[in-house]
């Protein structure tokens, strides 16, 4: 019996050492590629809107940027251990509207978010469809105020993704400063390759975009922690198994 305990102890120690080495390997500091540096700087600089066809890899790009930055953030879906999941109705400037700003009737409110913690909104076109612009204006008049003043209020940015640029609520679209199109995702086993194009507006009065860069982004599979079929669990009374979730991530479908 003593020999069995010794063997089990040795196996346990070996397992702990192996897991520790793997964690250190996965989270080791690596030199950022040009594409990664551009992404980190762009998301730190301004509000970014990511768009692309269904399954192109929009959430994969969000998850990769979040992993690169390694900072606390807020989102409507859990991308990583650093995500604080929020309801999107929490994105507001209290009960203050543009009318209150004009009339000087500002009502102070308690801070909801921490300083310098960005917000990532997945599938903005589902939550804020442009077909409901008028209703959204009436129901959430304070959200656009937050979007316009987020740098003043919390020194943060608000990033969104959607399938088509024109699909989200106009009040959200007009606050974007940078646009990234995800063309496709290719599976390479232990990593995914995302083809992206960066754009900016030609001028503030035009919705036409001009291309500024093109990159292929390498995304290690191990850094993807989110459920690529999140809305299945939101809407359907069933849940993917851990194996099915990992299979979806490795396939690069998001």
Give each language-model segment a name.
Residues 43-68:
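Glycine-rich P-loop/Walker A and Walker A-like loops and their local beta1-loop-alpha1 context
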Residues 192-254:
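Conserved P-loop NTPase motor module
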Residues 81-149:
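Conserved nucleotide-sensing/catalytic segment adjacent to the nucleotide-binding pocket
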Residues 75-81, 166:
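Short, polar loop motifs at secondary-structure junctions
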Residues 10-40:
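N-terminal pre-Walker A segment at the start of P-loop NTPase domains
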Residues 1-10:
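Feature marks short, highly hydrophobic, charge-poor N-terminal signal-anchor/signal peptide-like helices
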Residues 67-75:
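Post-Walker A helix-loop "phosphate-sensing" segment adjacent to the P-loop in P-loop NTPases
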């Amino acid at each position: 019996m003593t020999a069995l305990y010794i063997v089990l102890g040795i196996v346990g120690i070996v397992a702990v050492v192996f897991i520790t080495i793997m964690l250190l390997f996965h989270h080791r500091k690596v030199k950022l590629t040009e594409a990664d540096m551009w992404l980190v700087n762009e998301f730190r600089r301004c509000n970014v809107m990511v768009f692309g066809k269904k399954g192109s890899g929009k959430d994969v790009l969000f998850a990769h940027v979040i992993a690169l930055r390694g900072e606390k953030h807020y989102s409507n879906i859990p991308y990583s251990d650093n995500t604080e999941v929020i309801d999107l109705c929490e994105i507001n400037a209290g009960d203050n509207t543009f009318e209150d700003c004009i009339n000087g009737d500002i009502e102070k409110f308690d801070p909801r978010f921490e300083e310098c913690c960005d917000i990532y909104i997945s599938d903005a076109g589902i939550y804020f469809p442009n077909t409901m612009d008028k209703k959204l204006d009436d129901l959430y008049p304070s959200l656009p105020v937050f979007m316009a003043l987020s740098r003043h209020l919390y020194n943060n940015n608000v990033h969104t993704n959607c399938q088509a640029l024109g699909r989200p609520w106009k009040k959200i679209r007009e606050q974007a400063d940078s646009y990234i199109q995800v063309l496709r995702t290719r599976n390479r086993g232990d990593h995914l390759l995302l083809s992206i194009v960066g754009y900016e507006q030609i001028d503030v009065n035009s919705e036409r975009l001009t291309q500024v860069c093109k990159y292929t982004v390498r995304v290690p599979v191990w850094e993807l922690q989110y459920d690529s079929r999140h809305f299945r669990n939101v809407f359907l009374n069933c849940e993917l198994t851990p194996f099915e979730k990992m299979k979806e991530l490795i396939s690069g479908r998001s």
